[in-house]
A protein has these predicted regions:
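Aromatic-rich, lipid-facing transmembrane alpha helices and their immediate juxtamembrane interface loops
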Residues: 1-302
């Protein structure tokens, strides 16, 4: 088992390194018209990173999470392109390789990656992962707490789209039927992004709450890696593309809404690394909550 985990860690590091180098080099515009056949192959590196990290993070529950994320993204895209639901109006993709003739497979896989990155970053920020912090945080019940975590997941995904969507609309990757106020993108689109990510992670978090699993994880670089991937995918890739396209305003707004979460996650990671009680942590929030409740009882009896 230790060798298997070590091998997965190596795959995570390799995929993240390739992703970062390829994005920085500007060779991975996966949807843009000027992409090359070589660049297309790198478009799936982020997905591979997510799969490897999920296997390390969630183990046997990784397929459940990834399946929920894929289903949520696919359903929303099919409803959006066909009926204009979820995102406020109809839109269509200009790529030729579409699933059901409506949505490129790369878009569906990107949904999986974005939702997982949002989920993982929230877990890094989550004070419940620092068992002592739960003492004052979790007082309203675990279900409400999960609701708050999923809300943060939704914002993380939505903020990424605030730089992603304008770039692809400008490049002709997809077209909104009636345009929109935000660089040609309707505001309702971002509300849709929020709720799709929220729904996917909420389902999994509630499932985990009802069927707890005890999976401890060290707070090491692998634990922090989703933050690096999120920053690389969003800020580096789309920030550079925005600049190349002559629309730095996309990057300014996108980075402005993404960076605070990246900074908070980085700070949280550093704090947890320096706290002996938080290494390793349990990914089972119910176990964390029970431990904190026991700690509170002990404190009250002192």
């Amino acid at each position: 088992m230790a060798k298997a985990i070590s091998a997965v860690n190596v795959l995570i590091i390799v995929s993240l390194t390739v992703l970062a180098l390829s994005e920085i080099a500007g060779i991975v515009p996966t949807y843009l018209p000027h992409q090359t056949a070589f660049a297309k192959q790198f478009g799936y590196i982020l997905v591979l990173f997510v799969v490897f990290h999920a296997l390390r993070n969630l183990k046997f529950r990784a397929p459940i999470f990834l399946g929920i994320a894929f289903a949520a993204g696919a359903l929303s895209e099919l409803l959006g392109t066909t009926y204009g639901w979820i995102y406020g109006q109809r839109y269509y993709y200009t790529a030729s390789d579409k699933v059901f003739g409506l949505v490129p497979l790369s878009v569906l896989l990107t949904w999986v990656a974005v939702i997982y990155l949002a989920y993982s970053i929230t877990n890094i920020i989550d004070p419940a992962k620092n068992l002592l912090a739960l003492k004052k945080v979790v007082r309203v019940g675990s279900f409400i707490y999960v609701l708050l975590l999923s809300t943060l997941d939704g914002f993380l995904a939505m903020n990424l789209d605030m730089i992603l969507d304008p770039v692809y609309v400008r490049s002709g990757g997809w077209v909104w039927q009636d345009g929109g106020a935000y660089f040609g993108v309707p505001i309702s689109n971002f509300i849709g992004w929020f709720f799709v990510a929220f729904a996917a992670t909420f389902i999994f978090r509630v499932y985990s709450l009802r069927k707890p699993f005890d999976t401890a994880q060290k707070i090491d670089f692998i634990f922090f890696a989703p933050v690096v991937a999120y920053a690389t995918f969003g800020i580096v890739k789309y920030g550079v593309l925005s600049y190349v396209m002559g629309h730095t305003e996309y990057a300014v707004i996108g980075i402005s809404v993404m960076f605070p979460f990246i900074a908070i996650a980085t700070l949280s990671y550093q704090l947890k690394r320096s706290t002996p009680e938080s290494t390793p942590i349990s990914l089972d929030i119910t176990k964390d909550i029970n431990l904190t409740q026991k700690q509170r009882v002990l404190d009250e009896n002192r």
